């Protein structure tokens, strides 16, 4: 297995996307090791001292005022992990579990959490040998960190709970043993350091972000195809228009669409003598809408890159100041806001895509395309209900885009009285991205058919390659057939990057985190 060396505080989203997509093993840079050891020494000293230090020699949450004897330190940390294993729901998918573990490594690697090097080593070894905890997906309110799901991660390190090794679920004790690893016995504060933090919410949000960027790239491709299918004008994509406004995403979106459509015979065929003065907004305003969505994704990416490198534990060991201080870095409000931004972008990319689908199937608006893109309308319904399905998915995503960060509820006997709801705010992005892939897949079906109806005129070379990639597994719709497999396959081609992969990569390189 390939290994990636990460520097806490300097890790990029590109590196984290590699981890998520490729399942790489991860090791912290050697430069992080001295700080980790030094903070652990400070915690060990505090555990043997008389002064109360939260989570080191006290209880937790509302029980923080109860002093714990030094002899009970290990029991305190083990009890914390086991009692907090209260997650419910479907297990988190393995690639996101791996990302959670890597984010926890990065947080602990900042040298402010007080865990011993052997705790770091076990997480690294579990990643390298493919031991992944089974983590239920529900149960976090996003403050004090993602306690319940991270407890399930930590439990696997103790040999408790369940884990997956070599594709098979088993007890964590068995998984560790089969990988040649031993459970860790936690020292002072280590249990708290493992479960306190925003790593689950952040991993959910990052997975959603990576998929949303992939969808944004696909949307620029499908929208370019749609523009040619309805013989739309490229004049609204002129660079001068967008530089006058100045938004980076808008400028990039317009430039990308122009490049994708460059050389289209269809476009050249109606530069003169076209009675239409302006195209509908779903064509003309693509850069303004999709570009604004890309800007939102970039903003969310910046927040999540900072959070991925953050120490989000409590209390934190301030080695330079020789202090151990309670704070609130575990509160995932920045992640909740980022998740809401991503959700809005996903919903809007899908909304304008659906309007282009509706445009193409409507003979009153499609500039001479046949009704519902079938060569024999009446006897055949063509893509009539595919458009209806896209409308259903669009509306569902609008509902799912309702902000989660505006919600809060007090927990833990009102000690933790304001929470972020970041975890489920970020978890919904998986469902939203799946819906968006379906919408864009339907647009690809419609736009490809529309362009094919313009023969013998051809679209641009890049867009011809996209249609060819689609037609390898989804034949043209000559007459009605059982369509569900076509929709599933077109969504897969979007989701797995096959359609975008047919295009020279430099044309879409700007649309990344």
Curated annotation (Swiss-Prot):
Pathway: Amino-acid degradation; L-histidine degradation into L-glutamate; N-formimidoyl-L-glutamate from L-histidine: step 1/3. The keyword Metal-binding does not apply. One of its GO terms (molecular function) is histidine ammonia-lyase activity. There is a cross-link at residues 143-145 (5-imidazolinone (Ala-Gly)). GO terms for cellular component: cytoplasm. The keyword ATP-binding does not apply. It holds the Pfam family Lyase_aromatic. SUPFAM superfamilies: L-aspartase-like (SSF48557). One of its GO terms (biological process) is L-histidine catabolic process to glutamate and formamide. Contains an active site 4-methylidene-imidazol-5-one (MIO), which is formed autocatalytically by cyclization and dehydration of residues Ala-Ser-Gly. This is Histidine ammonia-lyase. It comes from Paracoccus denitrificans (strain Pd 1222).
